[in-house]
Amino acid sequence: MKPVIPALLAAVLPWALCLSATAHEIPAPAIVHNARDGVVRLYGAGGPDTAFRKVATAYQKNTGVQVVITAGPEPTWTKNAQANADILWGTAEQDITAFLETYKTFSSRDVMPIYIRPAIIAVQKGNPKGIRGFDDLLKNGMKIVVTEGSGVANTSGTGVWEDVAGRLGSLDDVKRFRTNIVAFGKGSGASYKAFVSMHADAWITWPDWPITHPEQADLVPLSKARTIWRDVNVVLAPDADPEARKFVGLLTSEEGARIMKTEGWVR
């Protein structure tokens, strides 16, 4: 007779490894979603939240309805979102698609792309290396940070650096760019920390990061030929508080657009 424990391990281990390598959280069957608590609750990755908070301030001033925005790495808020989220936001289409694998209350049919922004180059304050565009990043000795989910984190930055580097169909561009990468951050927050702590020369990211961290970074645009665009989107729960839809109405209004544009979000 074969030993039972090794046989069980052989059967279970591959499955367990697959779970540990997932780029999204696992649904908790014991959690029952109920968003009707009189508070508009939004959850999503860091980045858009700073602009969303400005819109929320205007909404609360006009209506008196509380809006609670929770942002950051998904593991820090997933259980609460499974319980009471009115709105999820995705920082890219692939980002929200991954979220919907966990938050089964929400439907892909209800996802609304609301704004879009371009990939840019963040450089150290004052741009000490004089970076003016993508070609400067191919120079020997450049230190570049990129954002990459690496199969274990859900982030809008996944693949962006490769899309930018390979935009013109040049394998040599990809090779030379990759040689200069000093950190792959599993999320924009992690990338920002690496950019600061390593005093990297450049970081391929989104406009909102240097805009909201002017003491640390400056923004250098990519050329039109190199620019990659990704959207921010929202999806409402079927049982969302009625005020949640009204908040989205303000978010997507002309007033909302003016606020969002202050951090690089356009449409």
Residue ranges with predicted function:
Residues 7-18:
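Bacterial N-terminal signal peptides
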Residues 24-146:
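N-terminal segment of the mature folded domain
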Residues 56-61, 134-185:
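Ligand-binding cleft/hinge of the Venus flytrap
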Residues 70-79, 172-193:
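Short helix-initiation/N-cap motifs at beta->coil->alpha
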Residues 93-102, 193-222:
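A ligand-binding cleft/hinge motif common to bilobed small-molecule-binding domains
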Residues 116-118, 147-149, 214-248, 251-267:
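Periplasmic-binding protein-like
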Residues 125-132, 151-153, 239-245:
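Short helix-loop capping/hinge motifs at secondary-structure junctions, enriched
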